[in-house]
């Protein structure tokens, strides 16, 4: 039930708050979609993964493809980093 509520909050952000700002996420999937997928896959640990992802998303980040890993990790997928 807590997972559903957290996902509801992210979807509320996606539909009602995010459209008011220009697109700025440097990753695919977007940080909010990543948060939802991480919560679905890893439960409450997924919230930590989503927060870590948001902290990595800044103007100096390379961005690119960074899917939710199958195992819990607060770091970016090393196999998906493109130089």
Curated annotation (Swiss-Prot):
<feature type="compositionally biased region" description="Basic and acidic residues">
    <location>
        <begin position="68"/>
        <end position="83"/>
    </location>
</feature>
<dbReference type="GO" id="GO:0005886">
    <property type="term" value="C:plasma membrane"/>
</dbReference>
<comment type="similarity">
    <text>Belongs to the UPF0161 family.</text>
</comment>
<dbReference type="Pfam" id="PF01809">
    <property type="entry name" value="YidD"/>
</dbReference>
<dbReference type="InterPro" id="IPR002696">
    <property type="entry name" value="Membr_insert_effic_factor_YidD"/>
</dbReference>
<protein>
    <recommendedName>
        <fullName>Putative membrane protein insertion efficiency factor</fullName>
    </recommendedName>
</protein>
<keyword id="KW-1003">Cell membrane</keyword>
<keyword id="KW-0472">Membrane</keyword>
<feature type="region of interest" description="Disordered">
    <location>
        <begin position="63"/>
        <end position="83"/>
    </location>
</feature>
<comment type="function">
    <text>Could be involved in insertion of integral membrane proteins into the membrane.</text>
</comment>
């Amino acid at each position: 039930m807590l997972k559903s509520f957290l996902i509801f909050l992210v979807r509320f952000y996606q539909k009602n708050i995010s459209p008011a700002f220009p697109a700025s996420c440097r990753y695919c999937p977007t940080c909010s979609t990543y948060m939802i997928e991480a919560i679905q896959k890893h439960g409450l640990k997924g919230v930590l993964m989503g927060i870590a992802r948001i902290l990595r998303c800044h103007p100096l980040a390379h961005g690119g493809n960074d899917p939710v890993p199958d195992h819990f990790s607060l770091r970016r997928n090393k196999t998906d980093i493109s130089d």
